[in-house]
């Protein structure tokens, strides 16, 4: 909801206090948040605390006053150099992008300015959390202070960070972030279908959540997705559109918090090389279809399942084109089955019971004599006790 000159010229206004739009007021946004809360929807804002645009008021003051600016230590600046814009000073930009001026997150005034903004958002809009842009760049001490501060505002305040590679535990732990983006499984999800190699995503899931003691993120809840605002939409990246319902079946069945990018619930298409406007298109109204129905049902199943939210992960059956895995909690056991092939597949495996309820279709299922998985199918079985 911030007013922007370009896709990257962010935070031109006083983002600590005002919704920056010519059409939307703070009162309007407070009403939006209130109505969302009444529908049981929590509001998580995008917090960009690593950098600001060149038009940010404090940086403009530095450009004007140089050494005499009280904000010169808000940024990583050298007055012995020069910038690409011939500013008469050098500054650090985010990953070499000098349209985005990196904030000094070890400066107490910067920290307090950010904290005051968050406090204002909680008090005025009652927000429920923050998604931290480029969290992998943020100072770890800052993240610890941010977690402590947000906990003091709201005990259940949610912090999720954008991370790409490496050990996610360095950001996701009891003193920093609650969750991070699971880019490892993002790649494994679409690649497993395009290469018809279910071993890839299964390997990642076992590495992250499997039954062995050494697995990386057991008990953690990573933000999982098949597309977002930075990557090609899943309907464009999959080589077989019949795999669309199946990949969402995997997304909602695997450990983690499933995230559906707006428009993708009906199969909107866009490629990264087409640029941000294509990836972040405006839709006049939803285009509800069969895919939307399946995703809606999967979301309902996930919401109401103890095992899918908190259960362990175990691989039951695995081939190049089929996989079955178990999610198990104290009171519930769920099997998720995927057949990515066009042909039916006969699966023989130990179900540990005789019957189950298939939750997508809400029909009983008998495991006697094995199970036939139709071509291009996903099943979610709630196993009998």
Report each predicted region and the residues it spans:
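Substrate-binding/active-site clefts of carbohydrate-active enzymes
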Residues: 16-124, 146-152, 169-170
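Substrate-binding clefts and catalytic carboxylate motifs of secreted carbohydrate-active enzymes
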Residues: 202-272, 289-290
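Single conserved hydrophobic/aromatic residue that forms the stacking wall/gate
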Residues: 1-20
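Active-site groove signature of glycoside hydrolases
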Residues: 51, 114-140, 224, 228
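Carbohydrate-interacting/catalytic domains
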Residues: 18, 30, 35, 244, ...
